Amino acid sequence: MTRLFGTDGVRGLANRKLTALLALKLGAAAAEVLTKDNRSTSRRPVAVVGRDPRVSGEMLAAALSAGMASRGVDVLRVGVLPTPAVAYLTDFYGADMGVVISASHNPMPDNGIKFFSKGGHKLPDSVEDEIEKVMETIPDGGPTGHGIGRVIEEAVDAQETYLKHLKGAVPRSLEGITVVVDCANGAASEVAPLAYAAAGAKVIPIHNHPNAYNINDSCGSTHIDQVQAAVLEHGADLGLAHDGDADRCLAVDAEGNVVDGDQIMAILALAMKENGELHKSTLVATVMSNLGLRLAMKEAGIELRTTKVGDRYVLEELNAGGFSLGGEQSGHIVLPDHGTTGDGTLTGLSLMSRMAETGLSLKVLASAMTVLPQVLINVPVSDKTIIQTHPDVVAAMERASDELGEDGRVLLRPSGTEELFRVMVEAPSKETARRIAADLASVVAKI
């Protein structure tokens, strides 16, 4: 049986793979697993549920809430809010679990469901596996009468509570900084502009009018050209681009150059080390991070630890080691002293705070890391399980590694959310990286 959970919860085409019935069963099973140790006679368990603005979110939220209520869990619906806001509110309200209905950067027809445990923490694989097992055996019946959970619609203070948290996490004034923020017509559309303005920045929001159908539609962190053009048009100091659920942030400097998650981590790591905030002088990233990040950190006396791709694995390493900064090249940046998951708005505030602290432009700050040319090709495949061990692929990988030696690297890995294999090559020149990646991708495509 194929595993239901991917690298970031359950995700798929809404009303086909991710149906209301599946959401109902997931809600019931997750309620059983995540609240089994927190039940008492004095109160019912509580779940916080938020979503992004895509049209299927309302349907899935209703089904999911019904499933949890059927197992005796009170459901606090907080409406459209970023994923990190739901994680924070799960902890703030003392809830037993949290749920986000979002497919992040995926197209509007997709959706997803991801869970948080008590305290706002993402689930380890073992707990997700337990939820899947319970889904197969959970009975139709449940509590009756007073034992049935209530569904409380739209907690009125949820957004304001999250905004206060952001202000407290990054209190430095951003007065004098002009920022363009691309909200992807997603969960950041209200929160991000409000947070940046409250910190003192002049904010120029774009793609901040969600209508249930336009999330990630030629905008946001996967369409960085939109914020690049707006920064140049308005003469802004920088631009920030969020994804649909606002757990990631990419940046653009005043000249329109992209500053990706690796560069953002380099900037923040150096700042935190200087200020005595980088615990154990260690940064946590993934195997997809550019080789240039490792070289820059080595020069600064900072250890770089790498994990599998997925911010959940970065989080596990951060928690296990007691570290204070980690993230992904894609813009998922985690600051454990201020949150339990990647937070795009917090990242944007932290980046601008460093600009305000130093008086330096984003371009100058980003120059602390030299980015090695990198090419990434996504190859559609029918069976992800056979690719890496196929003799033709093994031989092609060996040829590429022999050619690059210590001057680059090759990485081949399956997507955790789509039927794709990702071919990534770093090399001294873009041309070399592109050629080697294309050769390897052609081999994978024939399998």
UniProtKB/Swiss-Prot annotation:
Membrane-spanning ranges: none
Catalysed reactions listed for this entry: alpha-D-glucosamine 1-phosphate = D-glucosamine 6-phosphate
Cysteines joined through disulfide linkages: none
GO biological process, one term: UDP-N-acetylglucosamine biosynthetic process
Phosphoserine PTM sites in chain numbering: 104
Keyword Isomerase belongs to the record: yes
E.C. numbers: 5.4.2.10
Database matches in Pfam families: PGM_PMM_I (PF02878), PGM_PMM_II (PF02879), PGM_PMM_III (PF02880), PGM_PMM_IV (PF00408)
Keywords from the UniProt entry: Isomerase, Magnesium, Metal-binding, Phosphoprotein
An MF annotation (GO) of this entry: phosphoglucosamine mutase activity
Broad class of enzyme this protein falls into: isomerase
Co-factor requirement: Mg(2+)
A single GO cellular-component term on record: cytosol
Tree of life domain: Bacteria
Mod. after translation: Activated by phosphorylation.
InterPro entries, A to Z: A-D-PHexomutase_a/b/a-I, A-D-PHexomutase_a/b/a-I/II/III, A-D-PHexomutase_a/b/a-II, A-D-PHexomutase_a/b/a-III, A-D-PHexomutase_C, A-D-PHexomutase_C_sf, A-D-PHexomutase_CS, Alpha-D-phosphohexomutase_SF
Ribosomal protein recorded as keyword: no
Active site annotation, chain numbering: 104
Matching PROSITE patterns: PGM_PMM
Main function: Catalyzes the conversion of glucosamine-6-phosphate to glucosamine-1-phosphate.
NCBIfam families reported for this sequence: glmM
Family (UniProt): Belongs to the phosphohexose mutase family.
Protein name according to UniProt: Phosphoglucosamine mutase
